[in-house]
Amino acid sequence: MSKSENNAKTPKGVYITRTAAGKTLYRASVTKASRHISLGSYPDEKKAHKAYLTALKVLENNSISLDDFQDFKALKYEKAVILMNLRDNGIYFGTPIYLRKDYFNYHLTPEIVFTFDLEDLFYFSSHKISKRGGHFFVADYGSQVSIGSRFGLKPYSVEGRDCRFINGDPYDYRRSNLEVLNTYHGVIVSPDQKGYIARIHTSGYTKIGFYESALEAAIAYNKAADILNKKENKNYPENYIDEVSGKVYAEIYNSIKLDL
């Protein structure tokens, strides 16, 4: 646990903490519309105070945009996005989201800017995107889950083979722009494009259920396949799912409801 220190000489917007190991950290923060916003930790007091002053400048100057941000190296890019969205749209998100009229952008880096439908706003405002190799993940169900799984893509999907971005932008995950070419066994996008339907072919297609994510639908299909394989001595193929741990898979498998 870190212990806060009160220091009258510390510049405004900066406070000092010490870790249990005795390391000194300089944290910066700013207040906007009665909301206290952390700007992160810095190696020294000067850098922390500069981050605070830069944050104030961003909040008070509507002419400063993300395109101008190369001039403000003192403030972390993620924090700049959060502050500009709060300034321009009056809404605070803990992730680097900037709202547009009928979609939103998630600014991972200045070069990597995702575009999502508004219906995905709640999810990505509470799930931080990370990059590992050439793939993008969020922490969900206690594991790293590919962001593509939310849109019906298999883990480690390859553009051109498993999906196609219609406008050519590989970061534009709006459903109107994403054509899924290869998905999980027994999983299709719902007609309203707000979730996923799991189904299995018996004498015809039998609906297993409606699910918010493709991952849940794929696990529901596996559960239905297991039941039918045992009950009717069938040999339905199963989805190979390696994006969550065995423990998490079992938790979802055991709790998921089927409409069979």
Language-model segments: what does each one mean?
Residues 1-260:
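Boundary-flanking segments of nucleic-acid-binding domains in nuclear regulatory proteins
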